[in-house]
UniProtKB/Swiss-Prot annotation:
Compartment list: Cytoplasm
Main location: cytoplasm
Protein name: Ribonuclease P protein component 4
Enzyme class: hydrolase
HAMAP family: RNase_P_4
Cofactor annotation: Zn(2+)
Domain of life: Archaea
Gene Ontology cellular component terms for the protein in this record: cytoplasm; ribonuclease P complex
Function of the protein: Part of ribonuclease P, a protein complex that generates mature tRNA molecules by cleaving their 5'-ends.
UniProt subunit comment: Consists of a catalytic RNA component and at least 4-5 protein subunits.
Name of encoding gene: rnp4
UniProt lineage: Archaea, Methanobacteriati, Methanobacteriota, Archaeoglobi, Archaeoglobales
GO molecular function terms listed in the Swiss-Prot or TrEMBL record: ribonuclease P activity; zinc ion binding
PANTHER family cross-referenced by the UniProt entry: RIBONUCLEASE P PROTEIN SUBUNIT P21, RIBONUCLEASE P SUBUNIT P21
Organism, as annotated: Archaeoglobus fulgidus (strain ATCC 49558 / DSM 4304 / JCM 9628 / NBRC 100126 / VC-16)
C-alpha cells in the first residue's frame, strides 16, 4: 500500500483553487452561474485538502451565496474601523477590519 504524499496533494490542491477562482473571475460577466460553480468547487477542494484560500481571493466572492462580486452586484462602505461589503444578491454583509498602522517609537 502506497503512502500519501500530503505536501504534493496540498500543492496541487492550492494550484487548483487558484485556477478555479481565476476562472470564476473571467466568467463572472459571461455566465454568472458557471462562475459561482467554480467558486463552489474551489471551496470544496480547499476544505477537503485543508488548504487556506488567501484573504485577497476570499474577498472576491460572497461567503453566503458564493457569487463572485461583479459591478452593480455589491456595495462597499468604509467605516472607521472596517470595510463593509454587502452582496446585493443575497444581502450578506462581510465586515473586514482595518487595523491602524503601528508607529514604532524608540524611547
Amino acid at each position: 500500500m502506497l503512502r500519501r504524499d500530503k505536501k504534493r496533494e496540498s500543492r496541487i490542491a492550492r494550484e487548483r483553487v487558484f485556477y478555479l477562482i481565476k476562472r470564476a473571475e473571467e466568467w463572472k460577466n459571461i455566465d454568472y452561474e458557471l462562475a459561482r460553480r467554480y467558486v463552489e468547487l474551489a471551496r470544496k477542494i480547499a476544505m477537503r485538502y485543508r488548504v487556506r484560500i488567501p484573504r485577497e481571493l476570499k474577498a472576491t466572492y460572497c461567503k453566503k451565496c458564493l457569487y463572485p462580486y461583479k459591478a452593480g452586484k455589491f456595495r462597499v462602505r468604509v467605516r472607521k474601523s472596517r470595510v463593509i461589503i454587502t452582496c446585493l444578491n443575497c444581502g450578506f454583509e462581510r465586515r473586514i477590519p482595518i487595523r491602524p498602522k503601528r508607529v514604532n517609537r524608540k524611547v
